[in-house]
């Protein structure tokens, strides 16, 4: 099986608390984690900050439980979009956005969900779990997102903390599974404290409550997560690629512009 991953450890101003989250994840057997910086443009003067450098957290990375290698720490940016204008930062080649390994979008309306699935250059689409779903999922945009290699993220942290959130999480997850059939789904903790992280096998079992099959539940904490950060690598690389088009030689261009009958005479 691919390495286990939790792609949503919440970044805060307290580096000591963040170190505790990463250490706990390593102890539970996660090989990869992502530190998630969330930007909500509804709040005044919110800007995309530079991601936290791994060197700020650790001089020596924690070793993954049961492995001989250190944990891998990725950086993630999640942008909450409530207005189409908020998507502009994702359409442009923003230098700050490019600094992050994973870029996620949290659409709050059906229209924005459709745009996220079909057009935005992101790696993850976040699904709300803290309130009743404000719209119904439709198959066309979900299928386009799957074809584009985007992941759908469900977080289990709120379901652990609150009974009402648990109902919302399960209900919204089941609605998603009816459409995507478990494809490209990842499960993350959204943990702010170490006690909110669960072991990968427990999370995979939790996926059964969300409508995932046993195999899809395991993939949601392993292979699907790997696909997400590989998608991020491809996205970042694509920014640096300049495509070139071979121009035809003048004689070739002239030949192409001639009618077929005249070309035949010339060749004769």
UniProtKB/Swiss-Prot annotation:
Write out the entry's keywords from A to Z: Acetylation, Nucleus, Phosphoprotein, rRNA processing, tRNA processing
Query: In which family does this protein belong, per the annotation?
Result: Belongs to the eukaryotic/archaeal RNase P protein component 3 family.
Pfam families to which the protein is assigned, alphabetical: RNase_P_p30
Keyword check for Phosphoprotein, yes or no: yes
Q: Which residues carry this modification: N-acetylalanine?
A: 2
Annotated PANTHER family: RIBONUCLEASE P PROTEIN SUBUNIT P30, RIBONUCLEASE P SUBUNIT P30
One record GO biological process = tRNA 5'-leader removal
Phosphoserine: residues bearing it: 251
Leader peptide range in chain numbering: none
| Classification via InterPro entries | Pol/histidinol_Pase-like (IPR016195), RNase_P_p30 (IPR002738)
Compartments it resides in: Nucleus, Nucleolus
Q: Which organism is it from?
A: Mus musculus
Write out the GO cellular component annotations: multimeric ribonuclease P complex; nucleolus; ribonuclease MRP complex
**What function does this protein fulfil?**
Component of ribonuclease P, a ribonucleoprotein complex that generates mature tRNA molecules by cleaving their 5'-ends. Also a component of the MRP ribonuclease complex, which cleaves pre-rRNA sequences.
Q: Which SUPFAM superfamilies match?
A: PHP domain-like
What's this protein's name? Ribonuclease P protein subunit p30
Q: Name one GO molecular function term.
A: ribonuclease P activity
Assembly and binders: Component of nuclear RNase P and RNase MRP ribonucleoproteins. RNase P consists of a catalytic RNA moiety and about 10 protein subunits; POP1, POP4, POP5, POP7, RPP14, RPP21, RPP25, RPP30, RPP38 and RPP40. Within the RNase P complex, POP1, POP7 and RPP25 form the 'finger' subcomplex, POP5, RPP14, RPP40 and homodimeric RPP30 form the 'palm' subcomplex, and RPP21, POP4 and RPP38 form the 'wrist' subcomplex. All subunits of the RNase P complex interact with the catalytic RNA. Several subunits of RNase P are also part of the RNase MRP complex.
Keyword hit for Nucleotide-binding: no
């Amino acid at each position: 099986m691919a390495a286990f991953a939790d792609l949503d450890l919440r970044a805060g101003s307290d580096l000591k608390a963040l170190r505790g989250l990463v250490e706990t994840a390593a102890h539970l057997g996660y090989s990869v984690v992502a530190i998630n910086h969330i930007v909500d443009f509804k709040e005044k003067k919110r800007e995309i900050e530079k991601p936290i450098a791994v060197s700020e957290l650790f001089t020596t990375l924690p070793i993954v439980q049961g492995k001989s290698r250190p944990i891998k720490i990725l950086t993630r940016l999640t942008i909450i979009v409530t207005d189409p204008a908020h998507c502009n930062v994702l359409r442009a080649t923003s230098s700050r956005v490019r600094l992050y390994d994973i870029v996620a979008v949290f659409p709050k309306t059906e229209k924005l969900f459709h745009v996220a699935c079909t057009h935005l250059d992101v790696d993850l689409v976040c699904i709300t779990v803290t309130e009743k779903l404000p719209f119904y999922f439709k198959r066309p945009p979900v299928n386009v997102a799957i074809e584009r290699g985007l992941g759908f993220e469900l977080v289990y942290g709120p379901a652990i903390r609150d009974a009402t959130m648990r109902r919302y999480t399960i209900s919204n997850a089941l609605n998603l599974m009816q459409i995507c059939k478990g494809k490209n789904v990842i499960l993350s903790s959204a943990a702010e404290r170490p006690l909110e992280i669960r072991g990968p096998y427990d999370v995979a079992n939790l996926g059964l409550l969300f409508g995932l099959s046993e195999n899809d539940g395991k993939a949601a904490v392993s292979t699907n997560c790997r696909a997400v950060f590989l998608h991020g690598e491809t996205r970042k690389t694509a920014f640096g690629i300049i495509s070139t088009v071979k121009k035809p030689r003048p004689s070739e261009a002239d030949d192409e512009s001639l009618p077929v009958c005249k070309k035949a005479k010339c060749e004769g």
